[in-house]
Amino acid sequence: MHAAACFVRPAPEKREELLQTLRSLAVAIRADPGCLVCAVCLEETSTFFIVVSGWASDADLRGHLRSEHFRVLSGASRLLGASAEVRFLASHPPSESPVSVPT
């Protein structure tokens, strides 16, 4: 499995709005080709969310990173005063080529 995690830290007053946006977006991402899982994770005592997605292939993950859904995820984070960071989770066995995020 090829996986990515997006760590999103919203402005405190925008926390609930961003959570609802991320949950709706996760539903749409789950329908994307090659998506095995997409979940919004949060800790009640923390101020950040983690959106974790798993993909059947490296090509599926790369396609997601170029998708409208990923652009919406990035845009919603910025629009709602959040900072976001994307990290790639190691698959077993690790993929042969690293994935880079378009900027």
Q: For each of these PLM feature ranges, what is it?
A:
Residues 1-49, 56-68, 77-78, 82-103:
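Short S/T/G/P-rich N-terminal loop/turn motif that feeds into the first structured element of a domain
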